């Protein structure tokens, strides 16, 4: 009963209110106006989630190969980004990127009037995403690697399976479910990430989260309901998949 009340107050009633706003203020151009932000959210979410997963996988493998105290400390430092507010992280990344841009402008043959090479590109946004959500992917992948017995790795090394071949033929098949979970979790977080996206995005490059922020800042809560529902549906995807997987197992 208590859990039902919490679910009702925290999820069901807000979703019903969003649906009421969408129906009451529906306009013909609402969906078409959201197509580009929705596409941007999907693209940056998928690309960012895959990049975060790849970096996390390499870090976990490196940690398993080097069990020294230095490697452990370095691993923990690289996963601190999740504890840092997105706006603070965006500013922290923007400062060295701006300095690097100034150096590049001095040495690269750029046209007059060019004020940035890296700033305002998706590269900066993706770099910030990797730092921010690396811990989320690492925790999921580390859980999967606990099922990889050291004897399997030793046998592969004896058979001269090393480097990229070891990752492709041993690690990935054994932890592919954990890799999928990592991608899904990061994807959902990227879909609703706003501060980093707002501060590092290219000009006029909106996502659903940025569009919601713009509507709410102007007090247009009804217009923000439709993109909010889309993000909620995206967040329900991993919940449904995890529940199906748990029922199967």
Feature locations, PLM:
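Cytoplasmic-entry segments and transmembrane alpha-helices of multi-pass inner-membrane transporters
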Residues: 1, 58-97, 153
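Periplasmic/extracellular loop-to-transmembrane helix junction in inner-membrane transport proteins
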Residues: 13-54, 66-67, 71, 114-115, ...
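C-terminal transmembrane helix and the adjacent membrane-cytosol boundary/short C-terminal tail
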Residues: 59-70, 142-153, 157, 164-168, ...
């Amino acid at each position: 009963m208590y859990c039902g009340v919490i679910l009702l107050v925290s999820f069901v009633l807000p979703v019903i209110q969003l649906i009421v706003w969408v129906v009451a203020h529906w306009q013909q151009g609402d969906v078409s106006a959201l197509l580009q932000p929705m596409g941007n959210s999907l693209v940056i979410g998928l690309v960012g989630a895959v990049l975060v997963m790849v970096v996390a996988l390499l870090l976990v493998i490196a940690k398993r190969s080097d069990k020294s105290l230095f490697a452990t400390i370095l691993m923990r430092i690289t996963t601190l980004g999740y504890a840092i507010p997105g706006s603070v992280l965006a500013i922290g990344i923007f400062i060295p990127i701006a300095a690097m841009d100034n150096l590049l402008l001095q040495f690269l043959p750029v046209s007059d009037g060019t004020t940035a090479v890296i700033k305002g590109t998706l590269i900066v946004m993706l770099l910030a995403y990797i730092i921010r959500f690396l811990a989320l992917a690492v925790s999921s992948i580390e859980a999967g690697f606990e099922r990889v017995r050291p004897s399997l790795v030793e046998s592969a090394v004896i058979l001269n399976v090393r480097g990229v071949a070891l990752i492709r033929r041993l690690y990935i098949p054994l932890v592919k479910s954990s890799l999928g979970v990592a991608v899904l979790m990061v994807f959902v977080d990227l879909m609703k990430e706003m501060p980093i996206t707002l501060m590092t995005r290219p000009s006029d490059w909106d996502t659903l989260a940025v569009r919601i922020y713009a509507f709410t800042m102007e007090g247009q809560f009804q217009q923000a309901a439709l993109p909010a529902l889309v993000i909620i549906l995206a967040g329900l995807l991993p919940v449904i998949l995890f529940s199906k997987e748990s029922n199967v197992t």
